[in-house]
Design a protein with these regions (language model features):
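Amphipathic, rod-like alpha-helical scaffolds used for oligomerization/assembly
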Residues: 224, 230-239, 244-246, 279-282, ...
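Short acidic, glycine/tyrosine-flanked loop/strand segments centered on an H-E-D-like triad
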Residues: 244-280
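Short, charged/polar low-complexity linear motifs in solvent-exposed/disordered segments
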Residues: 216-218, 260-261, 560-561
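Interfacial loop/beta elements and low-complexity acidic/Ser/Thr-rich segments
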Residues: 132-199, 204, 211, 533
Length: 563
């Protein structure tokens, strides 16, 4: 590849040459150009695709993107597209799609995804267009989240009045006293067709009673200020962004009285008081301006400080509950679209790598009065299941229990006392784990090549566990429903008991998975709300929260249990 030599020379001269060389995997590309044979086709294809994806990474900075627009790099991308593509049979694609529509097999999904990638980097424009159609129809968003402004405002904890001492210097005088601040914080959604855009707004009042030490008397003052603080927030594909707060304060001060040791002295006391009042009148405009500036500055700093602390907690929870699980299961979260209206913020995501499919069935619509709604397609579970890396593996039950604990719960759980640790499980080479959302339940399917326990062995069996939703107020959880089911040849009583003895411990009857926690029902900020929709159908799990009324029940599938 001539372009590869030019890029190698270009990066050697660049300030970040070593980093670019590693990022673009130039050494790997050089190595693959020096070998031939069909046995290296897949290695070249995988490497070329990885490099092309890296070159179009949306996380690149503007400077990095500009570096990649240089002619040698454009030529390299064009040349390795030939490696990234491959032969495409439309008849084969049609057969895979037809079978996938009826079986939802992960193996068929992977085959369709592979053909899509070949078409994406094909030199044939018609195949490229067909690849885009596949991407649109079979890699649609598989997660949708919508949150209303009302719910965001419910989330904000009530602000208690704050009393604080006043120690300052205003208009050249030392001022001492006490102030009380009352604040109301609201969230205002700002319409935007491409991102989540909202403002934190604080409206507050500061009332103070102070004394200023001036010669020849002490002045007692009252101040009443009102302030507004606005802080712009953005959520886009790169994360959460907070802008500096802006503040404005208005108000006035008034003189309550003059105190002087000479007040009781005839004539002189009056003169002293008049002098003090005149000094106050002259300095009042400057004092009011300084008080306004001080109130605005403190409100602005308080908003930035408190919002910064809360956002740090949000980022930490987001990292713990979203980023880390995605990393554990080798998933990528790609926003398909985001938008904000005055009523709600909506985000559609695709949780999949380039090698995965995503949603391809119609998504349930949320009730129009929903304060929050959430829809999740079964492809999220199935793409995550690949991250378990169980296809074709053979391991004992103790190892399997530890692996599942680490992947799903991030820590090793204590084993059940009667876990058959030594039993060995060999999973199928394809579709070892699959999840289906249908018939009002979530079905977990395990394909087992062999289960061996001591001298006993069972081959070619499918394990089916079903989970149904249970609603209790604002709490929603999935519980295992009924007994485990098995399919396979010659499954008599003995083999079934053996299967129950192993998988009944890994998937216990009382197993529960929280969807919405009970804490929401106990939080007064969410009083008057209920689960208004819970649907599991056609590959989707859909959940909505909205206003509760005495006669209202959740719009749900018939298999939902309510308490």
């Amino acid at each position: 590849l001539h372009a590869l030599r030019e890029v190698t020379s270009l990066t050697a001269a660049a300030a970040e040459g070593a980093t670019w060389r590693q990022y673009l995997r130039l050494d790997d590309l050089v190595g693959l150009t020096s070998v031939g044979g069909d046995e290296f086709v897949e290695a070249r294809r995988a490497t070329a695709r990885d490099v092309l994806i890296r070159m179009t990474n949306p996380w690149l900075t503007a400077e990095q993107k500009e570096f990649l627009t240089q002619p040698p790099l454009i030529a390299l991308a064009q040349q390795i597209r030939n490696w990234a593509g491959g032969e495409v049979s439309i008849d084969t694609l049609a057969a895979f799609i037809e079978r996938y529509e009826s079986t939802n097999s992960n193996r068929d999904a992977d085959a369709i995804a592979e053909l899509r990638l070949r078409m994406k980097w094909s030199p044939d424009s018609q195949l490229q267009a067909l690849g885009e159609e596949l991407n649109r129809h079979y890699r649609n968003a598989n997660m949708r989240i919508a949150v209303s402004s009302e719910l965001m405002n419910r989330w904000i904890p009530p602000q208690e009045p704050v009393s604080a001492p006043v120690r300052s210097r205003i208009a050249g005088a030392e001022v001492r006293g006490q102030s009380q601040t009352e604040t109301q914080i609201t969230v205002r959604l700002l319409p935007d067709p491409t991102v989540w855009r909202f403002g934190l707004e604080a409206h507050g009042k500061v009332s103070s009673r102070t004394q200023s030490q001036t010669w020849p008397a002490k002045l007692r003052n009252a101040s009443n200020m009102e302030y507004e603080v606005r802080k712009l927030m953005l959520v886009n594909r790169f994360g959460l962004h907070a802008f500096p707060a802006e503040a404005n304060a208005e108000g006035d001060t008034r003189l309550l009285g003059v105190d002087s040791n000479l007040s009781a002295v005839p004539v002189i006391g009056s003169i002293v008081e008049n002098v003090a009042r005149e000094q106050h009148r002259q300095s009042r405009p400057r004092a009011v301006a300084q008080v306004k500036a001080k109130v605005g500055k403190e409100a602005r700093e308080r908003m930035d400080r408190e919002a910064g602390a809360r956002l740090a907690k949000v980022n930490e929870r987001f990292r713990e509950h979203v980023i880390e699980p995605l990393d554990r299961f080798a998933l990528t979260a790609e926003p398909v679209d985001m938008n904000t209206t005055e009523e709600r913020a909506t985000m559609r995501l695709r949780l999949a790598s380039e090698q995965h499919l995503a949603a391809h069935t119609p998504r349930p619509s949320a009730p129009s009065d929903s304060l929050a709604s959430f829809q999740l397609h079964e492809s999220v579970f199935n793409n995550a299941a690949r991250g378990l890396e169980l296809d074709g593996r053979r391991l004992n039950v103790a190892e399997l229990h530890a692996l599942l604990s680490q992947k799903i719960r991030r820590h090793a759980e204590a084993e059940p006392a009667d876990l058959p640790r030594a039993a060995k499980v060999e999973f199928a080479a394809h579709d070892a784990v699959r999840v289906a959302c249908h018939g009002d339940r979530i079905e977990l399917i395990l394909k087992i090549v062999e289960l061996r326990h001591g001298r006993d062995s069972i081959r070619g069996v499918g394990v089916h566990a079903f989970f149904r939703p249970v609603v209790d107020g604002m709490e929603v959880k999935l519980v295992r429903d009924g007994t485990l089911q098995f399919d396979g040849a010659h499954l008599r009583t003995g083999p079934r008991m053996m299967l129950h003895g192993v998988f009944g411990k890994l998937l216990p009857k009382d197993q529960e998975m929280p969807v919405l926690t009970a804490k929401l029902s106990e939080d007064p900020r969410f009083a008057g709300l209920m689960v208004t929709q819970l649907v599991i159908d056609d590959g989707w799990l859909a959940l909505s929260v909205g206003p509760a009324t005495p006669e209202r029940t959740a719009w749900r599938t018939r298999g939902v249990t309510t308490k």
